[in-house]
Amino acid sequence: MLKLIGSVMVFGSCAALGLSARQNLRRRVTAADAMLLALGLIRSEISGRRTPMPEIVGLLTENEQPIVRKVFRTLQRRLREQNGLSLGYLWRSTLRDCRAQVGRGTQECDILCDAANYLGRYDADEQLTGLSQVERRLAASREAAQEDLANRGNLYRTCGIALGLLVILVLI
C-alpha cells in the first residue's frame, strides 16, 4: 500500500514539474502580448493626444490585463514615492522587479527596459520612433517564445509524465 501511495505521489510530482515548465513558457508569451498592447497604448497616447507619461501610467493602472496593471501600478506608486528619480530609472527598476511576478523572460525584460531611453526624454516623434523599435524587438521575442512553447511545451509535459512512469516502474 505504501509503495502504491509513494508511486502516485512521485508520478504526480514529476508530471507537475513538466506541466509547470510548460506553463512558464505560456506565461512568457502572455506577458509579451500584454506588454505589446501596453506599448501600443503608450504610442497612441503620445502620438494622438500628446499625453504626459505620468497620465499614461495612470491610464495603464486601470487596464484590464492583470500583467499590465501589476507593472504600471508599481510604477505609479514609485513615481509618487520617489519623485526625485528619473522616469527612465523607475521604468527599468520596476520592470526588473516585476519580471518574475508577471512571467516575462530576461530577454523581454531587457527589451522593455530599452524603452526607458526614449520615454519622456525627447519630442514625440523621437519617442514614437524608439517605441516602434522596442515594439518590433518585443514582437520578435514573443514569436520566439511562441515557437519555444510549440516546440518545447509538449516535450516538457511528456518528459515529466514519462519520468514519473519510469520512477514508478523502478520502484515497483
Segment roles from a protein language model:
Residues 68-99:
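Interfacial alpha-helical end/capping and short helix-turn segments at domain and membrane boundaries
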Residues 3-80:
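Juxtamembrane/interface alpha-helical elements of multi-pass membrane proteins
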Residues 27, 33, 114-161:
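Membrane-interface, cytosolic juxtamembrane amphipathic helix immediately N-terminal to a transmembrane helix
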Residues 6-17, 143-172:
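Bilayer-spanning, highly hydrophobic alpha-helical transmembrane segments
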Residues 38, 42, 68, 75, ...:
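Amphipathic alpha-helices that form helix-helix packing interfaces
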Residues 94-125:
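Short, non-transmembrane cytosolic segments of multipass membrane proteins
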